[in-house]
Amino acid sequence: TLPPGFYRSLHPLGDASACNLSERNFLAALDDYRKLCALVEQHGGCIEQSLAGDTLTLAPGLTAEVLAPSGTRAAALTASMQELYRTPQGVPEFREKLDALDASMNNFSLILRLTFGKTRILLPGDTNRAGYGGIPPEKLAADLFKVGHHGQLDGADAALVNAVRPRFSVCCASSDRRYNSAHPDTMRLLKDSGAELYFSDCPPVDGQSIPPHRALEFTICADGASSARYLP
């Protein structure tokens, strides 16, 4: 989402200014982003920015269409990051800007729709239901949907599910439900739409017994046939 080389304008933040666990984690994530980008380039990797409208060829017959963020949204994130890093950590304004950025960051996620033959896969990152604005509903239609924001209550709504109409939905939810992932209302919404529900972990889900597993495997065929299984 951010421009290539943007990380070079960032400096270490540390967590001395954090007043709670959420702020401490977000500060650590910002520092990790800077370190990761530097490490990628040190090892000869190339950092590229993808924006809505781009199409990437991942393998023969497999493409990824970038649905979000738009150039305008990416520029807004860049400006917010620059403003945060220009503000001294010791002043109240820093925490205000930090918390505002933390609250909005998920909805700058890269949203991809993969196409392989007749099969489409929607990967919205950590986006919640408010992060799909500006994407034409027909672009969201998919056979396999990785539910955004870990399936929390704001991960999807009826309008989004009606646009996607997935045959399969995957929820990356922690078993301890610490952040209310795999929220019952969100899971019910998807199930009532006719989607088969699958999980990366084993959260308690009403009416469904999820076997202990170490992985979830999908087999996607170009003719539209798909299947899923838990690997014990």
Where would I find each of the regions flagged by the language model?
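Short alpha-helical interface elements
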Residues: P137, D185-T186, G194
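Flexible, acidic/histidine-containing loops and adjacent segments that form or flank the divalent-metal
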Residues: T1-L122, A195-E196, S200-P232
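Stable alpha-helical elements in mature extracytoplasmic
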Residues: A29-L36, G131, D157, T186
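Active-site-proximal loop/helix segments of hydrolase catalytic cores
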Residues: R73-A182
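Residue-level detector of buried hydrophobic side-chain packing
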Residues: S169, L190, F218-I220
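Histidine/acidic-residue-rich catalytic or RNA/ligand-binding cores of hydrolases
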Residues: D157-V161, S181-L189, I210-A215
